């Protein structure tokens, strides 16, 4: 019997090993295909100020319509919140759920989620097998390779054994049911596009990992430890996080890293957490320069400490949010992010050493004085103050638009229904 050469035996063993590992790839940044810089940045807009102006214009129009109708004595369900005014007034919202996909604003306005797909009804709250999930479960829905609009048959508490890895073109729509994702793994949006997460209670998320988890119909892989974020956005684009109630997680409530962009985070109620929102991977990760995020109409509520958000490199439009509590600071950053704060209400805590809204993290003033951090039309209460820098601080910044953030006095009203709404069929969706 002929003896095969050693080099040939080694090659055969290698090929066998690669084939065996086809479905068990280590799902980290090094194992996934790299894009060139043009592809990576293709979802970022060239003039982010134009997108910010569009948000202001939509808000101004909604506020004006709401105010004028009330003056004329008409009942109106309008709130001055252009997202909500787009769909919430319809008592038959449940018959036209996909209308929501046309209501986005800001950098994530083009996120269509599963609009062009069929409905998938989650009937089973269990999560027995993260590699081979049973039909009817949320995990089985989100891994499908086709667009889906995911809804829930009834109220349920879903305790995930591992992080829930969401595939592209998915909407998770909790309206009409009281849906909690809690006490286990939570949501990961990794290297995908067009995802909408709406109407969920996400809390008490735990670190998970060192396990196999399925991410699509055709792929599962070994996952290292996840941090325990409520929602983790990783290298993804066209993502909209709207009307969720988020609290008590091991790491962040919403984190977006590794070049994620075209994101809107809106109408959420965030409470009881330390490091709330991280936007940007690290000071040395240059691809986060393309990160563009709109943070609008959220209520940053009781029990929050810092990072609302904490930004790196990109462009961040913080508009018409209600900051009623923080313990250290509200908005922080490093690595020269642009922060455009407009029409927010900042109510400082009683602590005399925590009145400043802003914090430049581990950076001397000689560096951050050139960063473009600007405050326009913000309502500063209880001694709160915003330290501007860059062109805004020097007085040389001039808006190309005549728009201004005029609605800070109405922020309490605009954000009064932030968080997951108790929607019921046949009624307008309101708290």
Swiss-Prot record:
Entry's Gene Ontology BP terms: pectin catabolic process
E.C. no: 4.2.2.2
Family, as annotated: Belongs to the polysaccharide lyase 1 family.
Organism domain of life: Eukaryota
Alphabetical list of InterPro entries matching this protein: AmbAllergen (IPR018082), Pec_lyase (IPR002022), Pectin_lyas_fold (IPR012334), Pectin_lyase_fold/virulence (IPR011050), PEL (IPR045032)
Residues at the active site: 307
Stretch forming the signal peptide: 1-20
Organism: Arabidopsis thaliana (Mouse-ear cress)
Cofactor binding note from Swiss-Prot or TrEMBL: Binds 1 Ca(2+) ion. Required for its activity.
The name this protein goes by in its record: Probable pectate lyase 1
Source lineage: Eukaryota, Viridiplantae, Streptophyta, Embryophyta, Tracheophyta
């Amino acid at each position: 019997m002929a003896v095969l050469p050693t080099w040939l035996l080694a090659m055969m063993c290698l090929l066998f090993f690669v084939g065996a590992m086809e479905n068990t790839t280590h799902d980290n940044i090094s194992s996934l295909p790299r894009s060139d810089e043009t592809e990576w940045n293709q979802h970022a807009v060239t003039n982010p100020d134009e997108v910010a102006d569009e948000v202001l214009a939509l808000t101004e129009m909604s506020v004006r319509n709401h105010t004028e109708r009330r003056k004329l004595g008409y009942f109106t369900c309008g709130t001055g919140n252009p997202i909500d005014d787009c769909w919430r007034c319809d008592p038959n919202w449940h018959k036209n759920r996909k209308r929501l996909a046309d209501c986005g604003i800001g950098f994530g306005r083009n996120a269509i989620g599963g609009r062009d797909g069929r409905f998938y009804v989650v009937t089973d709250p269990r999560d027995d097998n993260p590699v081979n999930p049973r039909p009817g479960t949320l995990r089985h829905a989100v891994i499908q390779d086709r667009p889906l609009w995911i809804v829930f048959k009834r109220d349920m508490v879903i305790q995930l054994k591992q992080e829930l890895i969401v595939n592209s073109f998915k909407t998770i729509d909790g309206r009409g049911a009281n849906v909690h994702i809690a006490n286990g793994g939570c949501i990961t949006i990794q290297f995908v596009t067009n995802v909408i997460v709406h109407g969920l209670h996400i809390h008490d998320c735990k670190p998970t990992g060192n396990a196999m988890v399925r991410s699509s119909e055709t792929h599962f892989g070994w996952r290292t430890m996840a941090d325990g974020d409520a929602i983790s956005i990783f290298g993804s684009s066209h993502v909209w996080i709207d009307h969720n109630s988020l609290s008590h997680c091991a790491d962040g409530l919403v984190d977006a890293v590794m070049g994620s962009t075209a994101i809107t985070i809106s109408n959420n109620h965030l409470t009881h957490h330390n490091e709330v929102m991280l936007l940007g991977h690290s000071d040395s990760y240059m691809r986060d320069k393309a990160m563009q995020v709109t943070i609008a109409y959220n209520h940053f509520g009781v029990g929050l400490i810092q990072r609302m958000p904490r930004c790196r490199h990109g462009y961040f439009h913080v508009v018409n949010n209600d900051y009623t509590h923080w313990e250290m600071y509200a908005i922080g950053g490093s690595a020269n992010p642009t922060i455009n704060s407009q029409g927010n209400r900042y109510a400082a805590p009683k602590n005399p050493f925590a009145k400043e809204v802003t914090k430049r993290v581990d950076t001397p003033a000689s560096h951050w004085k050139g960063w473009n951090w600007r405050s326009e039309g913000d309502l500063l209460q209880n001694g709160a103050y915003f330290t501007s820098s860059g062109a805004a601080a020097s007085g040389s910044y001039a808006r190309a638009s005549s728009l201004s953030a005029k609605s800070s006095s109405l922020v309490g009203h605009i954000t009064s229904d932030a968080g997951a709404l108790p929607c019921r069929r046949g009624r307008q969706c309101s708290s």
